[in-house]
Amino acid sequence: MLSTENGEIHAIPITAPLRVGDRRILFRLKRCRESLARLREHPKVALTIFAKGNLAFTARGPARVVQEPMLGAPMFAAIAIDVENIDDHRQRDLVVDSGVSLDWNNERTQRFVQEHLNALREVAASGE
């Protein structure tokens, strides 16, 4: 879940963000969405992850557009978060055993997610 702030907090779901090194996370937003305009105006963001394997953290830092349009997905803009702070939400007595449950079982959706990640990997490899 990505949160941005411009007088009020806006939270939007992010599909399959990609970690690039210790302090950078890539994701993409549709170019026609208001969330992209909000991010340009107010780049300070927080990305919260709760996922299988006891992943529970919030990565905070400025976000910026690194490729628009994306070469592998022209309807999208690639966004990088330059992580400045990480809040660890794990607790000794509680374990996160699953995150948001999505049905990735149909072939079309699996192909979409794979294409999504491949497009982000291309951005990461380009050094943008």
Predicted segments — roles?
Residues 1-7, 45-48:
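A short, Trp-centered hydrophobic/proline-enriched beta-strand micro-motif
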Residues 15-54:
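A short mixed-secondary-structure module that forms the rim of ligand-binding clefts
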Residues 24, 44-46, 58-60, 76-80:
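Broad gene-expression machinery/nucleic-acid interaction feature
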